[in-house]
């Protein structure tokens, strides 16, 4: 059912906005569609069965498709940081006013249900020219937009950033706007940037803006780090592995993880990766192999260890098949049987178990 014959929106002015329009112009697969509604009130939406889900401003779920519909709105800066905004969603707000509040011109394009583009800010031209450009000076009112710019640069590797946009980001950082960012928002954008096709571009944007030292002051950022996270992206590593490589040269990786409130899985990988890389490079002895397996808790968490090896393989070659066989061989040992053999002399259990594991590795 198209929006032209959908009774839920019949008589409403609705437009697809933002990323779905941009990605369609780029020939990319369509993701979730966001809709903006012009000329309606919350009461109008409720009468049609739309489900309110918005917090700061009216957003509704379509009663059948569950797609998001937001009332057109304007916003005004009323405080510091990304939460310091007052929103207005009156029925008199126009589509052009709603588009004007958006971050980048490529994200400020709307499309009617019939497919007609509404582009008052020349976003289509910037899509074609592969340029990320801020919509207006209101960009400076929300420091999250610096992070989003970095994330979009990482996602769209062939896009450049307009010089005036980068200059504006620098002024924002110098004015202290980036200092108002909270960890949850930083992590949300950084993690999405790490999962993009060229994560190093995010670091480049944040560093050039002066924001990297503000939001991740512990991070050691250099060419090696950037090359490794890009190789991790090309290899399709999951987030934990990419984050571990990001932090590999950072002595204060635990402090960085706490600052960002990174997930436990990411912090564990960041802590263990330097151990794994050093151990893999140092020795091929069975004792060294067992030490690594035990220190990384590979017997209880083989999937995590496998992911760790894949991250280590970004740094130096790793025989993943051989290591998987080693872990499997050690896990196959019957620790209970060894304990029974040492009945009456518990002190013998630990060395006997280690000896059995070494023998298993020797035959793996």
Curated annotation (Swiss-Prot):
Belongs to the tRNA nucleotidyltransferase/poly(A) polymerase family. Bacterial CCA-adding enzyme type 2 subfamily. It comes from Bordetella parapertussis (strain 12822 / ATCC BAA-587 / NCTC 13253). Keywords: ATP-binding, Magnesium, Metal-binding, Nucleotide-binding, Nucleotidyltransferase, RNA repair, RNA-binding, Transferase, tRNA processing. Mg(2+) binds at residues 32, 34. ATP binds at residues 19, 22, 102, 148, 151. GO terms for biological process: RNA repair; tRNA 3'-terminal CCA addition. CTP binds at residues 19, 22, 102, 148, 151. Catalyzes the addition and repair of the essential 3'-terminal CCA sequence in tRNAs without using a nucleic acid template. Adds these three nucleotides in the order of C, C, and A to the tRNA nucleotide-73, using CTP and ATP as substrates and producing inorganic pyrophosphate. tRNA 3'-terminal CCA addition is required both for tRNA processing and repair. Also involved in tRNA surveillance by mediating tandem CCA addition to generate a CCACCA at the 3' terminus of unstable tRNAs. While stable tRNAs receive only 3'-terminal CCA, unstable tRNAs are marked with CCACCA and rapidly degraded. A single active site specifically recognizes both ATP and CTP and is responsible for their addition. Its cofactor is Mg(2+). This is CCA-adding enzyme. It catalyses: a tRNA precursor + 2 CTP + ATP = a tRNA with a 3' CCA end + 3 diphosphate; a tRNA with a 3' CCA end + 2 CTP + ATP = a tRNA with a 3' CCACCA end + 3 diphosphate.
